[in-house]
Amino acid sequence: MAHAAQVGLQDATSPIMEELIIFHDHALMIIFLICFLVLYALFLTLTTKLTNTSISDAQEMETVWTILPAIILVLIALPSLRILYMTDEVNDPSFTIKSIGHQWYWTYEYTDYGGLIFNSYMLPPLFLEPGDLRLLDVDNRLVLPVEAPVRMMITSQDVLHSWAVPTLGLKTDAIPGRLNQTTFTATRPGVYYGQCSEICGANHSFMPIVLELIPLKIFEMGPVFTL
């Protein structure tokens, strides 16, 4: 999860997030190289005493600054497209969970367990226990297993929402009248937090998402729900 004064990304808890962190570092390295090259060229331009007013064209230079950006764009686009296709893959999920966005809470349905449905509201400050996180903890957590592919079916009952859990690399829009899906495989047990990531009204900031990921063997003994 996130820490106080954290600058970087959260630790990855899924293969997709691991790929996103690698791609982030890859793109950041390219950006640093471009910035260094531009600043170096600017420094040379400002400090040089040489002048040349007889040059009317520079085909070699124009060729370089046309081909080089194209190569850089390809180096960014290829891994980006690879991750994009990975996020769209749905490979025989073990569990299917339906998530419905409301103003301003989430409803979850375990479709594989008799259609168990419950609502998940943010805990008001008066109900927080020692160790709970303000504006992030909920009354009913979504309990899921690790090391098992999970499919999330996401929609909305009223306005646009977005179901997002950064540590899993997930962000899927919840659109009224449309059912979007995403899959993930968690690699570590723990409690992970997210929030609605689409401005959805006055209390947009108060509809957190909490996932409690437990070992698959414990989950298979019987669903453990914090109701």
Curated annotation (Swiss-Prot):
Keywords: Copper, Electron transport, Magnesium, Membrane, Metal-binding, Mitochondrion, Mitochondrion inner membrane, Respiratory chain, Translocase, Transmembrane, Transmembrane helix, Transport. Mg(2+) binds at residue 198. Residues 46-59 are mitochondrial matrix. Its cofactor is Cu cation. GO terms for biological process: ATP synthesis coupled electron transport. Component of the cytochrome c oxidase (complex IV, CIV), a multisubunit enzyme composed of 14 subunits. The complex is composed of a catalytic core of 3 subunits MT-CO1, MT-CO2 and MT-CO3, encoded in the mitochondrial DNA, and 11 supernumerary subunits COX4I, COX5A, COX5B, COX6A, COX6B, COX6C, COX7A, COX7B, COX7C, COX8 and NDUFA4, which are encoded in the nuclear genome. This is Cytochrome c oxidase subunit 2. It comes from Pan paniscus.
